[in-house]
């Protein structure tokens, strides 16, 4: 929706909440919901940000949701535009519910990603995507791989939950909704949009409902804009800060020079804040079990590093280094008002914490490196050359299996490219499909950053920086972690750095770190 918002920004204050279960919004917590349930969530959102009444625009599934909000809560709606509204027959509805929404479950071999790529292609070749007759062929260009990849990433964010809002849209009494509409409404679609076939089925709509087909997608946006501008609108509210949610990590977008950084945090407990830093190709989501383990013990903050997770890449152009990440972390802490903290870094995130301790030693009181990358120069050079090859979207989807096996092999071999007997990780096999799937999504959320971040980590002078660190530092690793041997070697070489073996579950690490952090 960002392109549409930018198109209209000089006319309106545009606010686009992620539908529950999609993007960054929490799901409703049910496997089946009606569109009225989603509409109620929209009203709760309006209440939370202080909007009494608004004009609504929705596209495809959003078109159904916008109409549902107008139908169920007309007192909160000035006017509504539904672009891409579906009015299936009862037979079509039953077929769509049965065929359009297969379960999406990670497979050990990554086959679910190959299926999804084909699914993303088919939905712009046929409608419905599962039908292959000539009559179902769409008169559209096949989007380039980058555009398909963008849609695929949004699908991956929702996961199997993607079916909930789709099903609600298909089962919504859409014709009846238009007949009982009491606010001014426009229902439209371009001729190239497969939903345009439903416009003639909008029989006997309410007097204030306009049904109109347009020649092009751009024409639908111009028509929608004209409709929205005719309506009375309300003053935009002041931005409302995200409110804490007790007992869990809650999200915050932090304004910093160059963009925004996503923060996940919890402030239930008092004391000095613990800052948890993720690895390359990670985010605050990948360290969420570790961060959550501090809830009730300390305030905890986990920040998506620039270019990772949902953070903008705020690093200066060409400056992808551990030092640059440490400076960005310091800027984020300044914006959060955190003057002193303990830092717990997971794998490469520990290097960022270590550099922050050098950059701002008064800021970091205690430092933990979980799985420290204590490599000699020869191994660092080999890792820089071989560990992180860029992965680019491919027309036929081959990049998906490349990403899948890159992540999966990290749980089988060390380094992942040493697929020999010598490289076998013999302590445990970390190849759970759900875990691999989550980490593949992290790659795709950071397409231009993850591999550069790995290379930056492998160029960092970790041995020198550990030898000269002035902050009390703990080295730690679980017995399944290939970094354990490196951590032990570092502790032996640098006796001022104690080592601790960690529980197998990162959700236990917070409790295990507390004696050191509280010392």
Where are these regions (language model features)?
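Conserved HGGG/HGGXW glycine-rich cap/lid loop of the alpha/beta-hydrolase fold
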Residues: 1-26, 52, 264-312
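Conserved loop-alpha-helix segment in the C-terminal half of the alpha/beta-hydrolase fold
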Residues: 6-8, 184-217, 292, 470-505
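Active-site loop/oxyanion-hole signature of alpha/beta-hydrolase fold enzymes
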Residues: 15-61, 302-348, 509-510
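Short glycine-enriched nucleophile-adjacent loop
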Residues: 63-74, 80, 350-361, 367
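Flexible "cap/lid" loop of the alpha/beta hydrolase fold
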Residues: 71, 79-113, 358, 366-400
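Conserved serine/cysteine hydrolase catalytic core
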Residues: 150-200, 429, 433-488
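Catalytic active-site module of serine/aspartate enzymes centered on a nucleophile-bearing elbow/loop
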Residues: 203-253, 495-519
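A short loop-to-beta-strand scaffold at the N-terminal edge of the catalytic core in hydrolase folds
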Residues: 256-266
């Amino acid at each position: 929706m960002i392109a549409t918002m930018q198109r209209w920004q000089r006319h309106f204050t545009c606010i686009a909440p992620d539908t529950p279960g999609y993007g960054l919004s929490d799901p409703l917590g049910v496997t089946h919901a009606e569109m009225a349930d989603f509409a109620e969530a929209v009203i709760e959102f309006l209440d939370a940000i202080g909007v009494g009444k608004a004009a609504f625009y929705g596209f495809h599934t959003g078109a159904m949701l916008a109409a549902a909000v107008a139908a169920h809560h007309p007192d909160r709606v000035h006017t509504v535009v539904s672009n891409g509204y579906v009015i299936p027959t009862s037979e079509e509805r039953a077929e769509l519910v049965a065929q359009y929404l297969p379960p999406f479950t990670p497979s050990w071999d990554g086959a679910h990603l190959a299926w999804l790529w084909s699914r993303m292609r088919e939905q712009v070749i046929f409608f419905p995507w599962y039908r292959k007759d000539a009559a179902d062929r769409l008169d559209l260009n096949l989007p380039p791989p980058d555009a398909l990849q963008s849609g695929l990433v949004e699908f991956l964010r929702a996961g199997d939950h993607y079916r909930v809002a789709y099903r609600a849209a298909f089962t919504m009494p859409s014709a009846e909704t238009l007949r009982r509409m009491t606010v001014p409404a426009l229902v439209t679609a371009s001729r190239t949009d497969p939903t345009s076939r439903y416009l003639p089925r909008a029989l006997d709509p309410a007097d204030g409902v306009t049904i109109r087909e347009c020649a092009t997608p751009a024409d639908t946006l111009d028509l929608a804009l004209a409709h929205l501008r005719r309506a009375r609108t309300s003053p935009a509210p002041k931005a409302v800060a995200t409110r804490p949610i007790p007992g869990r990590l809650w999200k915050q977008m932090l304004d910093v020079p160059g963009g925004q950084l996503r923060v996940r945090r919890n402030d239930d407990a008092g004391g000095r804040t613990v800052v948890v830093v993720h690895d390359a190709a990670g985010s605050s989501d990948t360290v969420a079990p570790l961060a959550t383990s501090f809830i009730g013990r300390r305030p905890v903050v986990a920040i998506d590093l620039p270019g990772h997770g949902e953070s903008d890449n705020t690093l200066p152009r060409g400056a992808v280094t551990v030092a640059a990440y440490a400076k960005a972390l310091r800027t984020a802490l300044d914006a959060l008002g955190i003057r002193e903290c303990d830092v717990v870094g997971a794998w490469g995130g520990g290097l960022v914490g270590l550099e922050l301790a050098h950059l701002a030693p008064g800021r970091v009181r205690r430092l933990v490196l979980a799985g420290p990358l204590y490599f000699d120069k020869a191994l660092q050079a080999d890792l820089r050359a071989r560990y992180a090859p860029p992965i680019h979207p491919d027309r036929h989807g081959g990049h998906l299996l490349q990403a899948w096996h890159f992540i999966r092999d990290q749980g089988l071999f060390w380094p992942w490219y040493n697929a020999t007997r010598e490289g076998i990780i013999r302590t445990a096999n970390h190849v759970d499909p759900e875990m691999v799937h989550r980490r593949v999504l992290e790659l795709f959320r950071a397409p231009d950053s993850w591999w550069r971040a790995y290379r930056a980590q492998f160029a960092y002078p970790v041995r020198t920086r550990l030898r000269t660190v002035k902050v009390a530092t703990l080295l730690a690793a679980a017995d399944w972690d290939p970094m354990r041997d490196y951590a032990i070697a570092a502790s032996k070489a640098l006796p001022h750095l104690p080592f601790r073996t960690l529980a197998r579950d990162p959700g236990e690490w917070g409790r295990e770190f507390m004696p050191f952090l509280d010392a």
